[in-house]
């Protein structure tokens, strides 16, 4: 009975860790099978993969989840076209 409660708690925690960053404009990409001991281990794992926002260690799930920003800069959506068109009558 205790194992089932612990498993449910871990499932809810993993779900919350994935859902909350999505609401704030971030998402997470999780990598299973990573033997992590703390968040620093996951930061070292995430940074070379262009996940500069870091990551979190889910020890019980044996995985690292890296924060991935999904909000794009407004500047990148602007047109870079600098051609001026003059219309004369």
From Swiss-Prot:
Disulfide bonds: 30-66, 36-57, 42-64, 46-65
Cellular component terms per the entry's GO annotation: extracellular region
Keyword Heme applies: no
The keyword Nucleus is annotated on this UniProt entry: no
GO biological process, one term: killing of cells of another organism
Family stated for the protein in its record: Belongs to the DEFL family.
The protein, known as: Putative defensin-like protein 89
Gene source species: Arabidopsis thaliana
């Amino acid at each position: 009975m205790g194992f089932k409660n612990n498993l449910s708690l871990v499932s809810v925690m993993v779900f919350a860790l994935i859902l909350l960053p999505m609401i704030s404009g971030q998402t997470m990409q999780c990598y299973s099978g990573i033997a992590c001991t703390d968040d620093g281990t996951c930061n070292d794992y995430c940074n070379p993969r262009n996940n500069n926002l870091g990551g979190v260690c889910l020890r019980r799930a044996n995985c690292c989840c890296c924060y991935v920003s999904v909000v794009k800069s407004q500047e990148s959506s602007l047109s870079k076209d600098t051609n001026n068109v003059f219309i004369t009558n």
